[in-house]
Amino acid sequence: DAINSPVTCCYTLTSKKISMQRLMSYRRVTSSKCPKEAVIFKTIAGKEICAEPKXXWVQDSISHLDKKNQXPKP
């Protein structure tokens, strides 16, 4: 239930580019309960890293993950 799920907020955003090969998934933080919007990348190692959604490498990584995670069409 989205109403009762805990909200994860990012208070510090990395400025360091993360290699696309290390990324497994992402989710956007857009809750009004959070001080800033962010993208949380989950790495293959299981770490969660907050990033600035407007940064060019973040947008490139998101589109890379979207393409990678699309199920092949029959």
Curated annotation (Swiss-Prot):
GO CC annotation, single: extracellular space
Extract the InterPro entries matched here: Chemokine_b/g/d (IPR039809), Chemokine_CC_CS (IPR000827), Chemokine_IL8-like_dom (IPR001811), Interleukin_8-like_sf (IPR036048)
Q: How is it modified after translation?
A: The N-terminus is blocked.
- Tell me a Gene Ontology molecular-function term this record carries: CCR chemokine receptor binding
Is Signal one of the keywords? no
| Membrane spanning stretches | none
Q: Does the keyword Disulfide bond apply?
A: yes
Give the record's keywords alphabetically. Chemotaxis, Cytokine, Disulfide bond, Heparin-binding
* SMART domains per UniProt: SCY (SM00199)
Tell me, what's a Pfam family for it? IL8
In the record, biological process GO terms are: antimicrobial humoral immune response mediated by antimicrobial peptide; chemokine-mediated signaling pathway; eosinophil chemotaxis; inflammatory response; positive regulation of cell migration
Name the protein family: Belongs to the intercrine beta (chemokine CC) family.
Q: What does the UniProt function comment say about this protein?
A: Chemotactic factor that attracts monocytes, but not neutrophils. Augments monocyte anti-tumor activity. Also induces the release of gelatinase B. This protein can bind heparin.
Q: What protein name is recorded for this chain? A: Monocyte chemotactic protein 1B
